[in-house]
Amino acid sequence: MSEGDIINLPKLGLNIRILDVPGHTSGAIAYYTEKMLFSGDTLFTAGCGRLFEGSPTEMYHSLSKIKKLSDDVLVYCGHEYTVSNLEFASTVEKNNKSIQKRLSTALQTRKLGQPTVPASLKIEKQTNPF
């Protein structure tokens, strides 16, 4: 599958678009609907994936592509790294109150054994340093 391909699931009322998002790996793809993005290991909550096969330029372009999506899109990423990513983000953007607030909420959420995923693309744009 590659950019522009569509998976139609009529019984679920879903048309899932494929986005090419290299960076973490050279062949990474994401699955996108009007309301959801399954980003795999390209975009995490408050972070992004390591560069295993892709280049920094590829990752930059992939994250820029994702950033153009609607703020209302919910991001479902491949791992639950929110707390550690926010701890890092708080060292990069020390004066970002949104990061501090989100970190506090994420710590409480995880303490209760609840997931912090999904997160809206809007909150990602406010708190993700990448």
Model-derived segments and spans:
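Catalytic core of the metallo-beta-lactamase
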Residues: 1-93
